[in-house]
Curated annotation (Swiss-Prot):
It comes from Homo sapiens (Human). The gene is PALLD. The keyword Phosphoprotein applies. Pfam families: I-set (PF07679). Its main location: cytoplasm. This is Palladin.
Length: 1383
């Protein structure tokens, strides 16, 4: 049989082989061991041998131990040479006095498996590993061969001749031996028994193969440590080398195996990595531990590289070699600069081998503030567990009987997924080496099917690898999509040629039903092409409520029937009632009450489809990180083991309509019965802090009820570990793409539209959601909108690193955190609520019925629309802070304003004011014209006599930012959180002692966006908390604001309220204001937009200071508005320039920019004219429109033909308006490149005498001068060597007391905007005695040829260097002719 066949799949895990065995052969190479007939005979013989196993004696055990300590060399031998080599090997070791009876090696292998070397449970059938079974085979073989077991002499091959039974015994034992070695080698590898795998090279660590032992003090050991220890158990050098050869057989089959001679002891072998590096993603400040094993003869030399740069032993980077073959690289404290591709290179005279892995250091910034406090903390000496973003939901359902164990299954959302999501780590599984630059495109992350509601933002993203240049195109239904404001095509280039992966994104700013279809991303290069396809489903606004019915038919076939839900709900309420208030907060999500209860009934049918995991055993003895009832809890880091990309999930079921109606009726009856009693106070939803760090053991133990094993709902509610753990690999998507966007299915348990990081983490400007009342309306009739009571409420900041797409098939359920959150502060009672205020804990008493519990969880009134017309989340009033009823405006009489345009404006304003409450109740949205009027005129631009209080004035100044502005805000925050800050004047200082119960900063109240007029005061206010007390930094447009600023007043109160105030705003104050809070636990930032509008130039009265009653007169008709009798144009407003530039003077050749801002309804069109002639856009003239409505005419470069009178004309249906300015183009300054009037001369000087090197150069503008000696720049003057320059172009280098070291070539360079020129000369320094022997004989110089002309053009003036008068006389003492061309 083949020597390598048993090892070609050395790295395959047991779970893979178990799965393959159902459909194909158990092991691909077994056919090389035995024929099918021989296998059958061997197994029959094995059964008979087992029957004799009871008669085994203790002597055989001694015999096995002797054999094991002697020579395991034949583990790696070809079976046909096994006996011969055993004899030869034993004869080569006469000094070894131990007995070496020749036995087949299954006993030795068995000994190694059952020895204390491996503490793991064998991953194979106990039948195959029972020592009695293998010993029985040996005894049967001995009886067949008639060989005494006490013979000490080694046997020769002819002595081994036995009957056919002996040969069959030998083959059966060899088969078991090979299987045992395969299983033994496969177990420590980083695959888990349930089939989840990592790549053999450069793959991410799989989360399920991290047993709790990894986090103990010995956690830094390699997962292959069993092999290493087994190798160290082998005492003799021959045995060790043989084991290495056995490992060599395990390399991937694309490497050639060297033929093995009879004696493999000293045969040279090229290095091979038998254990490769693994990619990691760790938090900043954690320890990075890379290890690999390499074999080779002679022992290879191992070197480490990071991004091609060799690493050496330093205090920060420790490189070790243990046991000759285990090589480790440890970074004691990792920082973001350590991110990169690490390569280990092993070389010896026979060849070389490499292994590489990616190490990504997640910065300790507040971008991931919601989840960063879940950073994995391992004990000293432990390898930090890789952090990964995950969107999977794993529900572990415990059975009522402790004997039946648990079943783990995953659930898929109701969508239209057809393709599986490829793991982002798949691109790392490629051959090492430098030959990876030529390959066709490969999609490492496919597009995902998406379903959205009309008007939402859609992000389609995929990742592709391939040899550059990659051409990426997008298609919809076969038609190519061009980049436009509606369909933005983004392509992020790879960060290095070593990892040529591009991120391709298609962003649809606002979706309409006609946008639905099949979207295809096509990537091609010179070596091939690839495509990725996904389907986009757009539900129109009027069918939004039924979308849940139409989308959920894909994966329901396994879950059709459900028992009646009331008993389930009773279980849920009882289980919840026993929890602490902080635990209740985790699970009071509007959908969890029903979905958990319904889901726990599905798994009776799904138990037969477990993923290769024994139903009563779980995974590694754990039930998704929660131990069985008779086991101790694992460490928190085990609970938090994350996943990188989950497999596709099974479908979430729908309840039977009859059951649904039953529930509705029951809830309605109980609500009507409870209406006679005082209703429980609705609990407010204060801004929730980010998740605290993982609690210690006692806290986890306290979270577990002390009763019998938890009910299924308890497991379901807390089984998903760290669903929002941070970690972006090389890409950060702007925050506005994860604004709250919900599909709104018809019932509370329908499919939500996005993951927790998208639906419950809206963009930063969203206010806290309004608390909904509990009216007796069937809660199942309202869509799944905002989630007002989710533990990570809407005010939690949304992280800029890449969240899942808008609708991710793998992120279906908002998952409660594993750890309890701190209890929220009590709500501020309003006058109408004061009598009913109660603590959150009183809402969930034992006396509540299941239906009352559900009705308390689910909002009864229709929630506000999740998004506005722009696709952004709508703001609603925070709970506990009811909107103050505004006073009735005193409206001017109709007679006063009839016949003017003010009637239209006033009508619009009245609609806008009184429509706000309707908007919050989900009523029809504003029309396009109303929205434009609101945006252009401002919320406070009513044309009536309006007396307002200051707080109402401030409230009316708030406005919503556009998606483009939000994108800019996200980029600013992302950069700021990763940039150093100025610590001057900071009153908060941190010590080195870590704070107990530390908590990263979080915002209890965020900054708002304001739109004001020039000269008005403005105050940005927010409230921040954290432990220890965070430091606060303010920025404007990314630049830090000094606390000592005269223009801004920065304050911070004891309760954490921070404010930035300016008394009189100017146009320069327009911008984005960011506050960043930082403490040792992390950073977080929040941004408010301030739009400052210029005061109306057409006679608007100046704004009165805040605090005084503000009276505005009705807007008068503008003087240039035309005839008084022109008809009213309803809903149309004539253009009006809010900003216009004045006359400009620009130098010829420079850039000229003219900015203006115009308002009007409908939006005006702008055109530009120069001296009455239209300005056409071309390469030098560009017309741009920015997001904030600023129009720009950009001219680059400006020429004399561009001078003149420019007129900007704004036109819409209501009329037109214009302004003019004059552009004066100044003459271009004359530039002349530098030129040497007098050049440097070769000079000689006696030792100790001063010398001057001088020249003269002219140019316009005056050039800069640079001196060089040989190749060293002379940057500054010293006492001995000084550089001088005057206004007439004279340049001098003065050396006081020249020495031999001053001799050499000197170059002077002159540079200005027009060019650069250089000149070179030589300085020679000779000793004193040369001066007496100088010759006065004139010297002749042969004219130089033209071959030096090229050097002269480059600044080397060779002719000047060899002029007769320039040569010192000591060079011509012995020659009358200087060969200038030979110098």
């Amino acid at each position: 049989m083949s020597g390598t066949s048993s090892h070609e799949s050395f790295y395959d895990s047991l779970s893979d082989m178990q799965e393959e065995s159902k459909n194909t052969d158990f092991f691909p190479g077994l056919s090389a061991f035995l024929s099918q007939e021989e296998i059958n005979k061997s197994l029959d013989l094995a059964r008979r041998a087992i029957a004799d196993s009871e008669t085994e004696d203790f002597d055989s055990e001694k015999e096995i131990s002797q054999i094991f300590s002697t020579s395991p060399a034949s583990l790696c031998e070809h079976p046909s040479h096994k006996e011969t080599k055993l004899g030869e090997h034993a004869s080569r070791r006469p000094q070894d006095n131990r007995s070496t009876p020749v036995q087949p090696l299954a006993e030795k292998q068995t000994k190694s498996i059952s020895s204390p070397v491996s503490k793991r449970k064998p991953a194979m059938s106990p039948l195959l590993t029972r020592p009695s079974y293998i010993r029985s085979l040996r005894k049967a073989e001995k009886r067949g061969a008639k060989t005494p077991s006490t013979n000490v002499k080694p046997k020769t091959p002819h002595q081994r001749k036995g009957g056919p039974q002996s040969q069959l015994c030998d083959k059966a034992a060899n088969l078991i031996e090979e299987l045992t070695s395969i299983f033994k080698a496969a177990k420590p590898r980083n695959r888990s028994p349930n089939g989840e795998s990592s790549s053999p090279d450069s793959g991410y660590l799989s989360p399920k193969n991290q047993p709790s032992a990894l986090l103990s003090a010995s956690a830094s050991q390699s997962p292959m440590e069993d092999q290493g220890e087994m190798e160290r158990e082998v005492k003799s050098p021959g045995a060790r080398h043989c084991y290495q050869d056995n490992q060599d057989l395990a390399v991937p089959h694309n490497r050639k195996s060297h033929p093995q001679p009879h004696s493999a002891l000293h045969f040279p072998a090229a290095p091979r990595f038998i254990q490769k590096l693994r990619s990691q993603e760790v938090a900043e400040g954690s320890r990075v531990y890379l290890e690999c094993r390499v074999t080779g003869n002679p022992t290879p030399r191992v070197r480490w590289f990071c991004e091609g740069k060799e690493l050496h032993n330093t205090p920060d980077i420790q490189i070790h070699c243990e046991g000759g073959d285990l090589h480790t690289l440890i970074i004691a404290e990792a920082f973001e600069d350590d991110t990169g591709r690490y390569t280990c290179l092993a070389t010896n005279p026979s060849g070389s081998d490499t292994t590489s892995a990616e190490v990504f250091i997640e910065g300790a910034s507040s971008t991931d503030s919601d989840s960063e406090s879940l950073a994995f903390k391992s004990r000293a000496g432990a390898m930090p567990q890789a952090q990964k973003k995950t969107t999977s939901v794993s529900l572990t359902i415990g059975s009522s009987s402790p004997k039946t164990g648990v079943t783990t299954a995953v659930i898929q959302p109701l969508s239209v997924p057809v393709q599986q999501v490829h793991s982002p780590t798949s691109y790392l599984c490629r051959p090492d080496g430098t030959t990876t630059a030529y390959f066709p495109p490969v999609f490492t992350k496919e597009l995902q099917n998406t379903a959205v509601a009309e008007g939402q933002v859609v992000v389609l993203e995929c990742r592709v690898r391939g040899a550059p240049p990659l051409q990426v195109q997008w298609f919809r239904q076969g038609s190519e999509i061009q980049d436009s404001p509606d369909f933005r095509i983004l392509q992020k280039k790879p960060r290095s040629t070593a990892e040529p992966e591009e991120i391709c994104t298609l962003v649809i700013a606002e979706t309409f039903p006609e946008d639905a279809g099949i979207f295809t991303c096509s990537a091609r290069n010179d070596y091939g092409s690839a495509t990725s396809t996904a389907q986009l489903v757009v539900t129109s606004a009027n069918t939004e409520n039924c979308s849940y019915e139409s989308m959920g038919e894909s994966n329901n076939d396994h879950f059709q029937h459900f028992p009646p839900p009331p008993p389930i709900l009773e279980t849920s309420s009882l289980e919840l009632a026993s929890k602490k208030p902080s635990e209740i907060q985790q699970v009071n999500n509007p959908e969890l009450g029903l979905s958990r209860a319904a889901l726990q009934m599905q798994f009776n049918a799904a138990e037969r489809e477990t993923n290769g995991v024994h139903p009563s055993r779980g995974v590694n003895g754990l039930i998704n990180g929660k131990a069985n009832s008779n086991k101790s809890l694992p460490t928190p880091a085990v609970l938090l083991s994350p996943t990188k990309e989950p497999p596709p999930l099974l479908a979430k079921p729908k309840l039977d309509p009859l059951k649904l109606q039953q529930l509705q009726n029951q809830i309605r009856l109980e609500q009507e019965a409870g209406a006679r009693q005082p209703p429980p106070a609705p609990r407010s939803a204060p801004p929730s802090p980010p998740f605290p760090p993982p609690p210690a053991f006692p806290e986890l133990a306290a979270c577990t009820p002390p009763a019998s094993p938890e009910p299924m709902s308890a497991l379901a509610s807390r089984s998903a570990p760290a669903m929002q753990s941070s970690g972006s690999f090389n890409y950060a998507r702007p925050k506005q793409f994860i604004a709250a966007q919900n599909l709104g299915p018809a019932s509370g348990h329908g499919t939500p539209a996005s993951s927790p990081s998208s639906s419950s983490l809206p963009s930063p400007m969203s206010p806290t959601p309004r608390q909904f009342g509990r009216a007796p309306v069937p809660p199942f009739a309202q869509p799944f909108g905002a989630e007002p009571e989710a533990p990570w409420g809407s005010s939690s900041p949304s992280p800029p690193p890449p969240p899942p797409p808008v609708f991710s098939p793998t992120a279906a359920f908002p998952v409660p955190d594993v750890f309890p959150l701190p209890p929220p502060p009590p709500p501020l009672p309003s006058p109408g609520q004061a009598s009913h205020c109660s603590s959150p804990a009183t809402r969930f008493g034992h006396s509540q019925t299941p239906a009352a519990f559900l009705s308390a969880l689910l909002p009864s009134q229709p929630p506000p629309a999740a998004v506005n017309a722009l696709g952004l989340p709508k703001g609603v009033t925070p709970a506990g802070f009811p909107k103050k009823a505004s006073r009735t405006a005193r409206i001017a009489s109709d007679e006063e304003i009839q016949g003017t345009k003010d009637a239209v404006i006033q009508d619009l304003e009245r609609k806008l004011r009184f429509k706000e409450d309707l908007l919050n109740n989900g009523q029809p949205r504003l029309t396009y014209e109303e929205r434009m009027a609101r945006r252009l005129l401002g919320a406070d631009s009513a044309t009536v006599f309006n007396i307002q209080e200051p707080e109402e004035e401030t409230a009316n100044q708030e406005y919503k930012v556009s998606s483009c502005e939000q994108r800019l805000i996200s980029e600013i925050e992302y950069r700021l959180e990763r940039s150093p800050v100025d610590e001057s004047g900071d009153e908060v200082q941190y010590g080195d002692v870590p704070v107990e119960n530390g908590m990263a900063p979080f915002f209890e109240m965020k900054l708002k966006h304001y739109k004001i007029f020039e000269g008005m005061p403005v105050t940005f206010t927010c409230r921040v908390a954290g432990n220890p007390k965070p430091k606060i930094y303010w920025f404007k447009d990314g630049k830090q604001i000094s606390p000592k600023s005269d223009h801004y007043t920065i304050q911070r109160d004891l309760d954490g309220t921070c404010s930035l105030h300016t008394t009189a705003s100017t146009l320069d104050d327009d911008g984005n204001y960011t506050i960043m809070a930082a403490n040792p636990q992390g950073r977080i930032s929040c941004t408010g937009r301030l739009m400052v509008q210029a005061v109306n130039q057409r006679g608007r009265s100046p704004r009165s200071p805040s605090g005084h009653p503000h009276v505005r007169r009705p807007r008068s008709r503008s003087r240039d508005s035309g005839d008084e009798n022109e008809p009213i144009q309803e809903r149309f407003f004539r253009p009006h320039f809010l900003q216009a530039p004045g006359d400009l003077t620009v130098q010829e050749g420079k850039l000229c920019r003219m900015d203006c801002k115009v308002s009007g309804l409908p939006t005006p069109d702008l055109s530009w004219q120069l001296d009455g002639k239209p300005v056409r856009p071309d390469s030098a003239h560009k017309m741009l429109v920015r997001e904030n409505g600023v129009h720009s005419l950009i001219i680059e470069p400006v020429t004399s033909r561009d001078a003149g009178i420019y007129t900007c004309i704004a036109t819409n249906r209501a009329g037109q308006n214009s302004f003019s300015l004059e552009l004066v183009v100044a003459a271009k300054e004359a530039h002349k490149p530098p030129v040497f009037i007098e050049k440097l001369q070769n000079t000689g000087v006696a030792d100790g005498y001063p010398v001057r090197l001088e020249c003269r150069v002219l140019g316009v503008p005056p050039p800069q001068i640079f001196w060089k000696k040989e190749n060293e720049s002379l940057t500054h003057s010293t006492d001995r060597v000084s550089m001088h320059q005057d206004n007439h172009g004279y340049i001098c280098l003065l050396i006081q007391g020249a020495t031999k070291e001053d001799a050499g070539w000197y170059t002077v360079s002159a540079k200005n905007e027009a060019g650069i020129v250089s000149c070179t000369a030589r300085l020679d320094v000779y000793t004193q005695w040369h001066q007496q022997s100088q010759s006065t004989k004139p010297k002749k110089v042969r004219p130089s040829a033209s071959r030096y002309a090229a050097l002269s053009d480059q600044g080397l003036d060779i002719k000047a260097a060899f002029q007769p008068e320039a040569n010192p006389s000591h060079l011509t003492l012995n020659t009358a002719l200087v060969e200038s061309e030979d110098l």
